[in-house]
């Protein structure tokens, strides 16, 4: 469990808070507002908070997100693109963006879902048996799913559906930022209540 309470970030050169492959995160009274009277127009040059491939629940309560150049929060998983079928249930898969390289992604026992990368429609799933991360750009992934049964295995992507956290966002204020307030693409249950959004783009993007 991770608990952050009464944390004030007055300036950050990137994201103010980022969590990857963590579980059950609670953030209370977190602020990216500038000091009172400060002439500063920008506090965080990217997202205020960002949660990637997390498990359990992400909870944001009574937070004040101001003057970011991106979202107040972004909660999502990660896809890996299947490059090569090495065996019926073993594939080599790579990340779609260089900033994802080296991501922890999964551990044995996690549930892997295979999707058509053109449509993102599921084609099958199975538990992860083993994962070789020797190459930080591409991993060798062994699962219980027979990928050879798919017509075009190279047209697949893999997501770790054990890492789609639910989210509770309550009593938060978002304002003076140029992007969205909440970007929520997790598969988990989401509750947003008693919040105020004054962002340049959409308040809630699901």
Positions of PLM-derived features:
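Right-handed parallel beta-helix
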Residues: 2-11, 23-36, 55-67, 104, ...
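A structural detector for beta-sheet-dominated domains
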Residues: 20, 52, 76, 94-96, ...
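Small/polar beta-strand repeat architecture
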Residues: 124-125, 131-168, 175
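A structural signal for short, hydrophobic beta-strand segments that form beta-sheets
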Residues: 80-90, 125-133
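Short, recurring structural edge motifs at helix starts
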Residues: 47-50, 99, 155-158, 179-181
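Short glycine/acidic-rich loop motifs that flank beta-strands on beta-rich extracellular proteins
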Residues: 13-19, 35-47, 56, 69-75, ...
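Short alpha-helix capping/helix-loop boundary micro-motifs
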Residues: 91-101
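Ser/Thr/Gly-rich low-complexity blocks that favor extended beta-strand/coil architectures
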Residues: 101-136
């Amino acid at each position: 469990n991770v608990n952050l309470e009464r944390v004030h970030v007055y300036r950050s050169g990137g994201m103010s808070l980022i969590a990857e492959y963590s579980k059950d995160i609670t953030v209370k009274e977190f602020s990216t507002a500038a000091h009172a009277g400060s002439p500063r127009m920008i506090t965080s040059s990217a997202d205020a908070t960002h949660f990637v491939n997390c498990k359990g629940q992400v909870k944001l309560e009574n937070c004040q997100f101001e003057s970011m150049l991106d979202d107040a929060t972004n909660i999502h998983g990660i896809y890996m693109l299947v490059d090569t079928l090495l065996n019926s249930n073993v594939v080599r898969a790579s990340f779609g963006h260089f900033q994802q390289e080296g991501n922890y992604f999964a551990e044995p026992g996690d549930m892997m879902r295979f999707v058509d990368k053109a449509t993102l429609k599921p084609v099958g799933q199975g538990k992860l048996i083993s994962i070789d991360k020797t190459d930080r750009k591409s991993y060798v992934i062994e699962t219980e799913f027979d990928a050879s049964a798919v017509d075009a295995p190279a047209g697949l992507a893999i997501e770790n559906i054990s890492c789609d956290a639910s989210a509770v966002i309550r009593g938060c204020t978002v304002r003076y930022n140029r992007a969205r307030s909440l970007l929520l693409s997790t598969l988990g249950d989401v509750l947003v209540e008693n919040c105020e959004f004054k962002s340049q783009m959409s308040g809630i993007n699901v």
